């Protein structure tokens, strides 16, 4: 099989003491049974599944230790056990083998995603890619469309009131963005003019993200040359557009129906309903995915690790994708129940992100 770059997983570590081989084997069987069926598993079934010969009583003793460590719990009055969120995290981090996709699987994903390359727009291509990713993973697939890469041409400050100014950003493509800026008290017009000159000398030809990084560095180096009020106007100007990068970005979600498959109990249905509600809160999802763009690899959030979806007991597996210049411009991934098939979904999301990057010229 051809060599492929390794998958880089970015995930918090469980930080638990090393379990002995017997405990690991029993714990692995509990988790794998849960991922396969969604049902609690008891000591009698575990004793049949594990490689080493152990009586149900011995298995129960180990399960009691695992429960004390917070890795498993007993749901309601069931005699069986399920993994906790901490247990799932420990399994994903320390025990699970993230298999590489075989050539046939890669070819299947590549052929499905490459066919979207004839779409009329980037958004349409991503939409089609998501539909295929959702089908491959049997989960809801999400994508945050690319950031605007428009280059800046000019910035201008127009004073509206003693402590308010209009910031006008003009792009090389003719697009104009306006933001109202709160000025520090007592700022003279000369400081506003100097701030405008400082910014214009450094932003031309840069994207918004590039300009912000350049200005933060340049401002640190030029503090001795600028008076304090001018520095404050420059900092306020940078801040005025720093929160708006995600405002014109689209969140596309496909495959909601997959979340309704294989429900095991009424509480599952309630969790899915809560997840649907979370997905409707698109601003929160956009901000969450936007924050994940700083990562170089696959990120995994299990349950309450992701504050947005913590109430719905969901897992999120996401990976950034890139443009022709190799810059991260968006994020795609899947959202589903905590009993996702992690070993399969993780490499699928990773490979899908690589194919989308290729389609975008990355």
Swiss-Prot record:
Q: Which InterPro entries match?
A: GAF-like_dom_sf (IPR029016), HrcA (IPR002571), HrcA_C (IPR021153), WH-like_DNA-bd_sf (IPR036388), WH_DNA-bd_sf (IPR036390), WHTH_transcript_rep_HrcA_IDD (IPR023120)
Q: Which GO terms describe its biological process?
A: negative regulation of DNA-templated transcription
Protein family per UniProt: Belongs to the HrcA family.
Q: Which UniProt keywords apply?
A: Repressor, Stress response, Transcription, Transcription regulation
Q: What is the lineage of its organism?
A: Bacteria, Pseudomonadati, Pseudomonadota, Alphaproteobacteria, Hyphomicrobiales
State the name under which the record lists this protein: Heat-inducible transcription repressor HrcA
Which source organism? Answer: Bradyrhizobium diazoefficiens (strain JCM 10833 / BCRC 13528 / IAM 13628 / NBRC 14792 / USDA 110)
A GO MF term: DNA binding
Q: What does this protein do?
A: Negative regulator of class I heat shock genes (grpE-dnaK-dnaJ and groELS operons). Prevents heat-shock induction of these operons.
Which Cys pairs does UniProt list as disulfide-bonded? none
Cite the Pfam families for this sequence: HrcA
Entries under SUPFAM superfamilies matching the protein: GAF domain-like (SSF55781), Winged helix' DNA-binding domain (SSF46785)
Work out whether the entry's keyword set contains Transcription regulation: yes
